[in-house]
Each structure stands twice: as structure tokens, then as C-alpha cells.
């Protein structure tokens, strides 16, 4: 077993950074590599561009309801960036939004369910 929980987390982190750097060398302006599929207590997402390396660290959420996190994250980052946030701030806010969506997932079905895309909407009490 070569999972990060066995002490190889730094190896995976270096591989993620090398992969991001390769994409930058191919012409990408900004790269965010998600670390959510690695088995560890902490999720590390790697952001890289020509002038910044940023590692976003969050506690792993113990749930099987994470379907749609990648698409949701890219949409959230795009939204925050288009509203004038810096790319790093947009990534930070997007990751926080997805974490909140994971924490408030509706727990549908028995398999891997969706996250709660409406987590940031406050619904009036009379409509609940």
C-alpha cells in the first residue's frame, strides 16, 4: 500500500507539483490539482502558476456523498474569478464552497450521492 497514510504523502505531493508544472510548461496559465482521491486525513489541493505555488489544506470529510465535487469546484472558481477575485482567492473560496456543500450533503440513496449545491442559500423559515 503506497497511500499517503503510509508515510508517502510527500511523494504524492511532489508528483502533483511536477504534474502541475508540466501543464504550465505546456502553456496553461493556472493549474489546480485536487488531492481529494488520495487516502489521507488531510486533503491537499495544489495550485501553481508561473509566480505562485499554493497548497490548500482541509480536513477530509468522512462521507461517500461527494459526487460532483470536481465540476462544482471548477464552476465555483470560475464564478468567483469572474466576480473580480484573484485566481488564488477564487480557488480558496471555491474550495470552501465545495467543503460546505460536502458537509451539508442531502444523503440521498445508498451509493455515492451528490453534494448540496444549495448550501449557501438561506431559505425562509416559512418555506422549509
Question: Can you annotate each of these PLM segments?
Answer:
Residues 38, 83, 121:
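Active-site-adjacent loop and "lid" segments of alpha/beta metabolic enzymes
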Residues 17-58, 62-63, 108:
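Conserved phosphate-donor
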Residues 10-16, 82-92:
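Short, charged, surface-exposed loops that flank catalytic or proteolytic processing sites
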Residues 63-87:
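Short, small-residue alpha-helix embedded
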Residues 9, 37-38, 70-72, 76, ...:
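Gly/Ser/Thr-rich beta-alpha loop segments that engage phosphate groups in nucleotides
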Amino acid at each position: 500500500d503506497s497511500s499517503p497514510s503510509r508515510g508517502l504523502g510527500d511523494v504524492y505531493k511532489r508528483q502533483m507539483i511536477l504534474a502541475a508544472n508540466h501543464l504550465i510548461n505546456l502553456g496553461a496559465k493556472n493549474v489546480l490539482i485536487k488531492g481529494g482521491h488520495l487516502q489521507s486525513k488531510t486533503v491537499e489541493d495544489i495550485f501553481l502558476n508561473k509566480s505562485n505555488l499554493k497548497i490548500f489544506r482541509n480536513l477530509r470529510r468522512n462521507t461517500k456523498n461527494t459526487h460532483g465535487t470536481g465540476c462544482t469546484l471548477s464552476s465555483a472558481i470560475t464564478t468567483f474569478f469572474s466576480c473580480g477575485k484573484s485566481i488564488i482567492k477564487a480557488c480558496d473560496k471555491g474550495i470552501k464552497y465545495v467543503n460546505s456543500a460536502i458537509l451539508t450533503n442531502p444523503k440521498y440513496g445508498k451509493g455515492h450521492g451528490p453534494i448540496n449545491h444549495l448550501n449557501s442559500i438561506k431559505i425562509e423559515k416559512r418555506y422549509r
